[in-house]
């Protein structure tokens, strides 16, 4: 139930406050995080309450499809903002950017899609979770979505998601591994065979789209720039035999670890660096930032909170395990959380028992 998830969250919030008090340092973002969790939990309850009223009953699968389709809408907005500057101006006239967000978008405005916020690693993580959820959800039939639409959504999420953040590739890889495990367990289930057909159709459509773009639209500077950025790793794999990108090569230099036992245990209670454009100790690697923030004790509490949340949401063990593996993988690049996307799903238990996954 959500009560178990809330108890795990309380353990994490106490560690955050303890680290701040013991270090005598109250970083604005860091020390206010317990309040942020409380706000997310409250907003999640309100969202599910409204959906339950609007739909006359809400279930787990319908919420996840809403999350997926919301991401599709977010990506459509990304495309519009990239090719139509007036849309970009209207959006940012309504929603004000921080200095860090504005600087990041200015540096990458010609070679990647972007929308509200920096939307790079965070967006890639969200799209990855949605790709994995699509594969999980596609094992069932729905009245409100046709089976042939699913591979189109999957391909669209991956292609446009890669143009926003190449982290989206991680979601596709984990989703394919999950699909392989399902095939082994199903032993020839017709539903799974149909799912495999969908995936192969989606992969073929992506390959065909990439080929047509490369042949007929390479004279378009903007599209060529987007494609080169989105699929840099794949291009390098074919050309040099190594799946590397410019960002992945720099990433290993950002692995910086504490040099004292105090920081290893409870952290330094600091997230931001010397200015608003940098992180503490000049590292944005998830595991490093977690340890510098609140040490190994806080990191374990943080991971435990996400684990308990997934166990509340999913019933089938393989489903929450594969999402948890994807979550852990993201920490090798940046900090990713599950509470924003999965807390509303946990709130479903307060209204009715969700469909078993």
Regions inferred by a protein language model and the residue ranges of each:
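Long extracytoplasmic/lumenal interhelical loops at the membrane interface
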Residues: 92, 225-294
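Hydrophobic transmembrane helix bundles of membrane-integrated enzymes that assemble
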Residues: 6-222, 278-357
């Amino acid at each position: 139930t959500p009560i178990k998830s809330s108890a795990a969250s309380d353990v994490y919030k106490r560690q955050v406050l303890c680290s701040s008090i013991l270090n005598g340092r109250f970083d604005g973002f860091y020390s206010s995080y317990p309040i942020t969790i409380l706000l997310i939990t409250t907003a999640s309850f309100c969202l599910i309450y409204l959906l339950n009223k609007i739909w006359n009953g809400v279930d787990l699968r319908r919420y996840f499809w809403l999350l997926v389709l919301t991401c599709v809408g977010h990506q459509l907005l990304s495309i519009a903002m990239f090719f139509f500057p007036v849309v970009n101006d209207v959006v940012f006239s309504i929603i004000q950017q921080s200095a860090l967000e504005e600087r990041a978008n200015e540096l990458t405005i010609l070679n990647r899609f972007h929308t509200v916020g920096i939307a790079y690693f965070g967006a890639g993580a969200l799209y990855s979770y949605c790709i994995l959820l699509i594969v999980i959800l596609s094992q069932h039939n729905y009245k409100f979505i046709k089976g042939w639409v699913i591979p189109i959504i999957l391909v669209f999420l991956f292609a446009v998601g890669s143009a926003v953040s190449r982290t989206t590739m991680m979601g596709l890889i984990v989703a394919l591994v999950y699909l392989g495990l399902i095939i082994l367990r199903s032993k020839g289930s017709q539903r799974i065979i149909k799912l495999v057909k969908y995936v192969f159709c989606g992969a073929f459509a992506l390959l065909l789209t990439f080929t047509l773009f490369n042949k007929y639209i390479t004279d378009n500077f903007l599209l060529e720039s987007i494609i080169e950025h989105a699929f840099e790793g794949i291009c390098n794999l074919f050309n040099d035999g190594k799946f590397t990108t410019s960002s992945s090569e720099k990433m290993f230099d950002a692995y910086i670890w504490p040099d004292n036992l105090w920081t290893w245990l409870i952290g330094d209670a600091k997230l931001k660096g010397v200015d608003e454009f940098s992180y503490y100790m000049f590292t944005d690697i998830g595991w490093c930032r977690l340890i510098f923030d609140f040490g190994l004790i806080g990191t374990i509490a943080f991971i435990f909170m996400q684990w308990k949340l997934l166990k509340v949401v999913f019933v089938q063990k393989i489903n929450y395990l594969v999402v948890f593996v994807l979550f852990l993988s993201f920490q090798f690049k940046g900090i990713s959380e599950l509470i924003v996307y999965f807390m509303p799903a946990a709130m479903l238990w307060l209204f009715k028992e969700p469909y078993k996954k």
